[in-house]
Swiss-Prot record:
This is Translation initiation factor IF-1. The keyword Cytoplasm applies. The gene is infA. Residues 1-71 form the S1-like domain. Transmembrane segments: none annotated.
Length: 71
């Protein structure tokens, strides 16, 4: 799968879960579970409750995603 196949959405962090996972509400009112991308972990970017984030998702599983940017 190439980067072109991934879908990006904007959402808000609703809940902090263990192991750097988050419950995110997308702009289209869907709830997903998202984890922090490796680059955000490496640079120690903190994600807090209520933060606006950009989530990258695969078209095969629309219930999970990866947080790639914090606004």
């Amino acid at each position: 799968m190439s980067k072109d196949d991934l879908i990006q959405f904007t959402g808000t962090v609703l809940e902090l879960l263990p192991n750097a996972n988050f419950r995110v509400k997308l702009e289209n009112d869907h709830l997903i579970i998202a984890h922090t991308s490796g680059r955000m972990r490496k640079n120690r970017i903190r994600i807090l409750l209520g933060d606006k984030v950009t989530v990258e998702m695969t078209p095969y599983d629309l219930t999970k995603g990866r947080v790639i940017h914090r606004h």
